[in-house]
Amino acid sequence: MSKQRGTFSEVSLAQDPKWQQRKPKGNKSSISGTEQEIFQVELNLQNASLNHQGIDKIYDCQGLLPPPEKLTAEVLGIICIVLMATVLKTIVLIPFLEQNNSSPNARTQKARHCGHCPEEWITYSNSCYYIGKERRTWEESLQACASKNSSSLLCIDNEEEMKFLASILPSSWIGVFRNSSHHPWVTINGLAFKHEIKDSDHAERNCAMLHVRGLISDQCGSSRIIRRGFIMLTRLVLNS
């Protein structure tokens, strides 16, 4: 501390004009050393100021926020992410799940929407189907169907109907036949049958049957058990 006081005293005296007139010529080197020390102190102060300004500039350029503001920004970012996820879930996921859930309901409603079929009849689209579980030949099934509400042995109309019936029935006669293996397949109404029937090599398999594998030919006089036995189908067309 005494050394610093001495230095500043010398600096003050050195700056005083009177002192400069009085000072002996032999102290020239001492004054020069003092001036160098003063210059060094000023230089150090300038460097410290520049370093402080440089740190501030680097801090600003990096975009760093003070801790409270940075925390607030992170919280807002998380909230934005959660809101975006919720919106995406609402837009994409919920309609997809609703569509999947509505598909079985739509099929059920289509199968039961008329609601005017007699008891023990199955409703699908605009038709009613009766399932006769007795083992019968094709001719016996034809006669049994004719005795129920003026219906007849079913003739498959389209692929959708065939797939629906095949999915719930093991096997059943349908109202399609031919006179021989050399004749075309026709319905009991005398119309040409347009769907494919898997034929067999047996010459006497001239009656058509609905099977899980599709439409196949079988012996008209057969009542043998296949899976759960033959099931007779009839259809009563309803007014929509």
From Swiss-Prot:
User: Compositional bias (Polar residues) at which positions?
Assistant: 1-12
Do you know which SUPFAM superfamilies this protein is assigned to?
C-type lectin-like
Compartments annotated for it: namely: Membrane
Tell me what topology the record assigns in the membrane.
Answer: Single-pass type II membrane protein
The answer to keyword Secreted applying to this record is no
Q: Tell me the GO molecular function terms.
A: carbohydrate binding; transmembrane signaling receptor activity
> What PROSITE patterns does UniProt report for this protein, alphabetically?
C_TYPE_LECTIN_2 (PS50041)
User: For this UniProt entry, what is the primary localization, expressed as one broad class?
Assistant: membrane
List GO terms (cellular component aspect): external side of plasma membrane; plasma membrane; receptor complex
Give the protein's function. Plays a role as a receptor for the recognition of MHC class I HLA-E molecules by NK cells and some cytotoxic T-cells.
This protein's assembly is summarised as: Can form disulfide-bonded heterodimer with CD94.
Q: What is this protein called?
A: NKG2-E type II integral membrane protein
Quick one: which gene encodes this? KLRC3
